[in-house]
Structure formats: structure tokens, C-alpha cells
Swiss-Prot record:
InterPro entries hit by this protein: DabA (IPR018752)
Protein name: Probable inorganic carbon transporter subunit DabA
Cell compartments where the protein resides: Cell inner membrane
Species the sequence originates in: Salinibacter ruber (strain DSM 13855 / M31)
Function: Part of an energy-coupled inorganic carbon pump.
Subunit structure: Forms a complex with DabB.
Family assignment from sequence similarity: Belongs to the inorganic carbon transporter (TC 9.A.2) DabA family.
Keywords: Cell inner membrane, Cell membrane, Membrane, Metal-binding, Transport, Zinc
Signal peptide extent: none
Region listing for Disordered, in residue ranges: 598-617, 794-817
PANTHER family: INORGANIC CARBON TRANSPORTER SUBUNIT DABA-RELATED, UPF0753 PROTEIN AQ_863
Keyword Zinc carried by entry: yes
Length: 817
């Protein structure tokens, strides 16, 4: 029976909305696993997702019990929420009831032969250079390539030669769908796309990027995926259509009410503590400042980990810190020195507009040549090693002859990781990396240098330089009072042998370190022409202000400054003082961080704390080098004066903003439609990875295996894992470190300004209306009164508190907090 291809395509596109995109490990991006459900209320969405993916939508009773015993859920708040639903039992009784209800729900899913066979071929086709023997005919597309090799798969019955299978994708759909009315096609597609949401999410991501090398060479689409899966299901006797009992109800929700109540009470308790602390800080901080010009100002990413180091830097002396999206407003593709690889270095919701290359500075040509010689030697050695390991004739002799060497190296990496790290540092001192002799190509190159594949121009036009510099200062509300030194500080992690390293790097840079972006913006702002153009636009940068770039190592809290040591742009004594204070801040921040990492480091030993973080950064067996963004709970948009001196426990995204310098609301609009949305993606990924790690996370790192250099699976096969590993979320088997709360956005701005932005951007408004996030406004035109947004529109006024309570939740003895 011929089928209408346009109808099939439309039904597949509709069904694919239920599957969120999954980025490859190299550019891991945090994203809401229920991204396709955000147009629905949260409670309804998690119910639908639970039926499709089998995952929970709310924290389990063990998590609620930990929060209750730690005092994180206010008793009065919980009692009020329960009373609104006519529930009068004691919280302990309700926790026991939820325990009983949860018993037996975590049974492992039954093994599906269809999934096992299909994932084997998906891994072979989508391999990105890991396999020594790649799947043949991949250039013909997934269905055609699979059809040629399927006869050799003994798990597929009745296929002796390719001609036993439909010849084309269209014929495959016709063969399977002829028994079903058109009205059932979309539920069938939903059923099969959501059976393996990790693999289909990756295919969805890759198929929408036809310009990527792997997709161009080996094309695949969800249509081809469904053609293979439906053909396999037909051959293996698996269900084609979902059971009618699995179909989703049209309206309403029958989700258990208790978890919803407890979650809302927990979220309100956190919100109340945070707002009380902010109010108390506002009352004790004098308006205005007579501190004068600071010694230095440092701009950090809004990342929650920046809150800790910013606080400790400010305690060292006359320093100011600001928060800005970690790609520093420059939508670029970065090409590191000595490689043809190009990496996206801007948020996942932004397309690169420029290609920035690293080229040796003229005074450092000799240093670059020495580095090139060493790099060629390393490359040749790596190629030889790969050949010996993969060559059939040489591999056995190679293993016999080199076993002692590799065994000793493995023992050293395991038993003395810090020692090897110091050797690496000594090598870096002898042969510094490209950052020491290269400079970014910020000037626009001739059109002939534009990339032939994507057309991105190399460098930036003069107008773009001014635009990015002005946007950075405008969004932060920073138009005057520039220090002699301003440091744009990107961030990146340091961790070996970690498939999820990109998840610890800068999310605003697409899972890459933010140092390159910081160097670009610093170079732009140092140009005389840019500063002159900024003066004409009302941003006066003093003649003695120098812009530097740096990178915050979030694993060790070390901040490296990118400075030409032979010709530093800052006076040596000022540079030494800044570095000394940054080192002191590192020690204080490390002391704070190690308290949450279950270490044996004693309190009050900063040097030992730094050594412990450095060990974790070097240890290839360390499953938890750092916590990443675990604990994130709030996104604060406002001047640093709102939070300066307040210990936010590394749980808040901090974006600098001054409503008084943003008359038309453009800066706030950019923040709410950009960084705030990315913050919601990060928060929901941590939330769902915590509430149901089996469905939305990636399990234990100990049992993960990398497949095809694109993702991880648990054990030796199965679905691609889409979320975060347990070690990024839990302190141990019983206690969570990440508190699964939906993100609270707090914005200091006039209420009508925020409301106007929501009216113009329905997608952002839906996140609040459907309770994927909560919104509170601190209205400066109403004496900084807190007003809370009501889903669907309108505002709740919040009465002023009688006294402040601590933002940090109290912890009971013996329970990690």
C-alpha cells in the first residue's frame, strides 16, 4: 500500500517533540530531559514522561526524609501545604507511607531483545573513531548500511540476504504500517522513539547539524532509525503499536499528591530563607559606597561555583567581582593552536558568528617553534603506539614487550597522581603551552580566510568588537568606576579519565573552557578604537585601565592569568599582589569545598585542602573530582551589592544587572531570554538526574563504558545515558548532595518591566506559568518589596520578615548536608 511520505514525515516530526536532543560527550550540554514537555504544566509533564520513559517526576521519600531531618523543610510551611489538601497526619507518618508506596517501584526493566539488537547496530553506525573496524557502507545512510549487514546478524530471524528486507526506507514503512490506520501512526512513532530516548536524542541532535563532519559523511535521521526499528520489530515479533492501556489521558493528572506537596513546601522553605537573608543584607549594607576605586575587578561566569571563589576574593582586599555569561557575549567558534579541530564556544541556543584562531605572537616565534617540534614528536609517538596496538601481526609482541612499562605507568598514576601532576607542571614550565605565546585573531581576516564549510569569518569586524564590549558592560549595568585592572575570568575543570569532563566545563561555552572567550573580550576592550567608541556611547574607561584574561580552575579554585611574562601590561608589584590574593582566595575556597567531599582533611588547614583538590584533579581513579553545579537552586539577577558578603553556599547563579541603567529593559530582556533559560536547562538536568537516575541520569561511573566516543552506556550495551552520573549528585548511597528543587529566579527590577518581557516572550513565560521555574521580583520602585509571580499571571506580595534565618539549611548530626 503506497503511503503519503509527507504525512509520515509530519507524524515523525510531531512524535520527535517528546525526545530532547542529546549532545555528544565532547560538547556535553546540560538540557532538560523533558524539553519536549515544557509547553505543559510541570505536574502533567512528569506524568506523561513517566508513562513514556518510566521515570519518576518527584524526589523519593528517602530524599524528603533527609531534607526534613536536616531542617531544610520548614515545619509550619509543610503543615500549611498539607492542610490545604485536608491532610493532618504527622510528617513522619507521611514519610513512612511514601516509603511503602515506593517499595517495588525501582525494579529493573525487563531486557528487550529488540532494543539489544538495535543498539548494537546504532553503536556501530554512529561510531566516531573509536572502533578499529568501522561498519561498512555508512556513507549510504543508516537504513541502507544496516540492510547490507543484517543478514550476518544471527539475532534477526528470516534474513538470509539483503533482498529479504524492504529495499528503501519508504518500502519499510509501507510494509509495517499497512495494517494500521493513519490515526495510529503517530502513537506508534512515539512508542518507538521513546523506547531508546538516549540514542534517538543523539540522532535528533546530529541530524539537525548536517554541516558536522560525521553527519555529512554518515547521514542518519529519525526517519531511518524508525525504518530500521520497525523492520526489526516486525521480523522479531515485537510489538509494533503500543498497548492501548499505555495511551495518555487527555487532561488532568493522577500523580500522587504527597510528593507534590513535599516538593512545594521544600521549595518555599528555601525561598523564604534566601529572601530573608537578602533582606537582612540589604538592611545592614549602607546605600552607596565610599570605598573608592577598587584595586581590581574580576568578571566571572554566572556559574554557581563562581559564587564561592568570588566571595573569598572580595574578602582579600579592595576587589569587586561581577557575574556575566561565561562566553562573555562573543558567539564564536574556537580553533586551538596546532589543530584543525574547531569547537563551538557559545551557548547551545546560540549559533557561532565568528571563528577565532590562535596564532603565535611575533616576539614568541622561537617558543612556538620549540612547541611545534615537541607536538610533532608526540603526534608521531601516538600514531606509532596506535598502530602497534591495532595491528594484527604486531599486537601480541607489543603487549608482551611493553607490559612492564605500562604496568609501572599505571601504578604511578594510581598510587602517586600528585607526583605525576607535578612532573606535568614542570614540563609545562619548561615548555609552556600555546596560551603563553599565542594571541587570538580578533581582527577581521580577508574573506578568503573564511571557512569553506560554514562560512564563518575569521576574527571580528570593528563594529562587532564595539557591540560585544558595549553589550557586556550594559548587561552588567557597569558604565563607570573601572579599576586599574579588570580581569575577564573564564572557567574550566581539571579531571583525567572522565567521560563527563565537558559537563564540568563552561555550559555557556558548549561544554568547553571559557578562557578563549575571556581572552577575546579582553583583547577587544584593550583596543583604543573600541574604548573611544565606548566613550561616545557613555561608557568611559580610564586611560590607565588594563583588561586581562584568566581562567578559574573549578576543581582546584586556582585562577591562572593569561599574561605575557616577558612584557606584562600591569606593573609587576600590582600583578604580584593580585596573584598573591588570588592564591589566598583559592586556599579559602578549597577549604570550604573539601568539607562537602568526604575527605580526611582537618578544618583550618588551607594548604592541605589545596593539596586535596589538586590530588582529585590529577587522580585518574577519582570518581568525584568536584561537585560541578550540584546544589543549584536560584538564579539572582541584580547588582553585587544585593549579595556581597552573603554566604550563598555555592547554590546561586549570579548575573550582574543594574535596573537603573537599563531604561528600556533591553539588558534584562537579553538576560531573561538567554542565561536564565540556560540556567533552567542546567537545573532541570540536575533535578531529573537526581529524582530518577536510572531513567534520566547515567548511573555509576564505575560501570559506565564509552561507546563510539559519543556517549556512555551502562555495562556492555543498551541505551545511551542522557544525564549526570550518581557521583555528581549523591554523597553516598543514602544521601543526596544535590537538592532537587526547581530553579527560583530572583530579579531586582520594576515589576512592570519584568511583566512586559514575559508578555513579549511566551516561551519564557511558559516556564513560569507551567512551574518549571519560580519567579520572584525585588521591585525597587516599591521599596524593594518582594513580589512572587503567580502561574498564569499576577503577583503575590510577600510580607516583610520579622527576623533573618540562615540560607544554609541546618544539618543534623551524622547526615551529610
Amino acid at each position: 500500500m503506497p503511503i503519503d511520505r509527507s504525512v509520515v514525515r509530519a507524524r515523525i516530526e510531531n512524535a520527535a517533540e517528546y525526545v530532547g536532543p542529546l549532545w555528544p560527550l565532547r560538547t556535553f550540554n546540560a538540557a532538560n530531559p523533558l524539553l519536549g514537555f515544557e509547553d505543559q504544566p510541570f505536574d502533567r509533564a512528569v506524568q506523561k514522561a513517566g508513562q513514556l520513559f518510566g521515570g519518576r517526576g518527584y524526589p523519593g521519600p528517602t530524599v524528603f526524609r533527609q531534607a526534613w531531618e536536616n531542617g531544610e523543610i520548614d515545619a509550619d510551611v509543610l503543615t500549611r501545604h498539607l492542610a490545604e489538601h485536608g491532610i493532618t497526619e504527622r510528617p513522619e507518618v507521611l514519610l513512612d507511607r511514601m516509603d511503602a508506596d515506593a517499595a517495588g517501584r525501582d525494579a529493573a526493566p525487563a531486557d528487550q531483545p529488540l532494543d539489544r539488537v538495535l543498539t548494537k547496530w546504532l553503536a556501530a553506525f554512529l561510531d566516531q573513531g573509536q572502533a578499529a573496524w568501522p561498519m561498512p557502507n555508512r556513507e549510504d545512510g543508516f537504513y541502507a548500511a544496516w540492510r547490507t549487514v543484517a543478514p550476518y546478524d544471527g539475532d534477526i530471524p528470516g534474513v538470509g540476504r539483503p533482498s529479504d528486507l524492504p529495499g528503501t526506507v519508504v518500502e519499510a514503512f509501507e510494509a509495517v504500517l499497512e495494517s494500521y490506520p493513519e490515526a495510529r501512526w503517530e502513537p506508534i512513532f512515539v512508542h518507538h522513539l521513546t523506547a531508546l530516548p538516549g540514542w534517538t536524542g543523539f540522532i535528533k541532535w546530529r541530524s539537525r547539524r548536517a554541516d558536522t563532519a560525521w553527519q555529512a559523511a554518515h547521514p542518519i535521521s529519525l526517519t531511518e532509525y524508525l525504518a530500521v526499528r520497525l523492520t526489526l520489530a516486525d521480523r522479531m515479533g515485537a510489538a509494533i503499536a503500543p498497548d492501548r492501556t499505555d495511551e495518555l489521558p487527555a487532561n488532568g493528572t493522577d500523580q500522587p499528591v504527597l510528593p507534590r506537596i513535599w516538593l512545594r513546601a521544600w521549595e518555599e522553605s528555601y525561598r523564604t530563607r534566601l529572601l530573608d537573608d537578602l533582606r537582612q543584607t540589604q538592611q545592614t549594607t549602607p546605600s552607596g559606597s565610599d570605598a573608592g576605586r577598587p584595586d581590581a575587578q574580576l568578571v566571572f561566569c554566572i556559574d554557581t561555583r563562581s559564587e564561592v571563589i568570588r566571595r573569598h576574593i572580595e574578602q582579600q582586599g579592595p576587589y569587586e567581582t561581577h557575574g556575566y555569561a561565561g562566553f562573555f557575549g562573543v558567539p564564536m567558534q574556537h580553533q586551538p593552536y596546532g589543530t584543525e579541530e574547531r569547537v563551538k564556544s557559545c551557548p547551545p541556543i546560540v549559533d557561532p558568528k565568528h571563528r577565532i584562531m590562535e596564532r603565535p605572537a611575533e616576539p614568541h616565534r622561537a617558543q612556538a617553534e620549540r612547541y611545534d617540534w615537541w607536538a610533532r614528536l608526540q603526534k608521531a609517538g601516538a600514531a606509532l603506539l596506535k598502530t602497534l596496538k591495532k595491528n594484527v601481526a604486531a599486537v601480541f609482541g607489543f603487549v608482551e614487550g611493553s607490559g612492564g612499562f605500562f604496568g609501572a605507568a599505571m601504578a604511578a598514576r594510581t598510587l602517586a597522581p600528585s607526583g605525576l601532576s607535578r612532573l606535568d607542571e614542570a614540563l609545562d614550565d619548561w615548555l609552556p603551552g600555546p596560551a603563553s605565546f599565542c594571541e587570538p585573531t580578533v581582527d577581521r581576516a580577508p574573506p578568503a580566510d573564511a571557512d569553506a564549510e560554514d562560512g564563518l569569518p575569521v576574527g571580528l569586524a570593528d563594529e562587532a568588537k564595539v557591540l560585544y564590549a558595549e553589550a557586556a558592560f550594559r548587561l552588567m549595568g557597569w558604565t563607570d568606576t573601572f579599576a586599574p585592572v579588570v580581569v575577564f575570568t573564564g572557567h574550566g575543570s581539571q579531571t583525567p579519565n572522565n567521560p563527563y569532563k565537558a559537563s564540568l566545563d563552561c555550559g555557556a561555552c558548549a561544554g568547553n573552557p571559557g578562557g578563549p572567550n575571556a581572552r577575546v573580550l579582553a583583547a577587544i576592550c584593550n583596543e583604543d578604537a573600541v574604548q573611544e567608541a565606548l566613550r561616545e556611547r557613555g561608557i568611559a574607561i580610564p586611560d590607565d585601565t588594563v583588561f586581562l584574561a584568566g581562567q578559574h580552575n573549578t576543581t582546584t579554585d586556582e585562577i591562572a592569568l593569561f599574561v605575557d611574562e616577558d612584557d606584562p601590561p600591569v606593573a609587576p608589584d600590582a600583578l604580584d599582589r593580585l596573584r598573591r590574593d588570588l592564591h589566598a582566595a583559592q586556599a579559602d575556597a578549597a577549604t570550604e569545598r573539601v568539607r562537602t567531599l568526604n575527605t580526611s582533611v582537618d578544618e583550618g588547614r588551607p594548604a592541605a585542602a589545596v593539596r586535596e583538590t589538586e590530588r582529585r584533579a590529577a587522580d585518574w581513579a577519582e570518581t568525584r573530582p568536584e561537585w560541578g553545579l550540584a546544589g543549584n537552586a536560584a538564579f539572582i539577577v541584580g547588582p553585587r551589592a544585593l549579595t556581597r558578603g552573603l554566604d550563598l553556599d555555592g547554590r546561586c547563579f549570579l548575573h550582574s544587572y543594574d535596573w537603573a541603567t537599563d531604561d528600556d529593559g533591553t539588558a534584562l530582556e537579553n538576560i531573561m531570554t538567554g542565561p536564565l533559560v540556560v540556567g533552567e536547562w542546567i537545573n532541570t538536568q540536575y533535578y531529573f538526574s537526581t529524582v530518577d537516575n536510572a531513567a534520566y541520569g547515567s548511573g555509576s561511573k564505575v560501570t559506565q563504558n564509552v561507546v563510539g566516543k559519543l556517549g556512555v552506556v551502562q555495562g556492555n550495551g543498551g541505551d545511551l545515558m542522557s544525564g549526570l552520573p550518581l557521583q555528581s549528585l549523591k554523597a553516598d548511597d543514602e544521601h543526596v548532595h544535590h537538592r532537587p528543587l526547581r530553579l527560583m529566579a530572583l530579579i531586582q527590577a520594576p515589576t512592570d518591566r519584568v511583566e512586559a518581557i514575559l508578555d513579549r516572550h511566551a516561551a519564557v513565560a511558559h516556564l513560569f506559568d507551567h512551574e518549571w521555574m519560580h519567579l520572584t521580583v525585588m521591585d525597587p520602585e516599591q521599596d524593594d518589596a518582594f513580589v512572587r509571580y503567580k502561574p498564569g499571571g499576577g503577583w503575590h506580595a510577600r510580607p516583610a520578615p520579622d527576623a533573618s534565618t540562615a540560607t544554609k539549611a541546618p544539618a543534623s548530626a551524622g547526615v551529610p548536608s
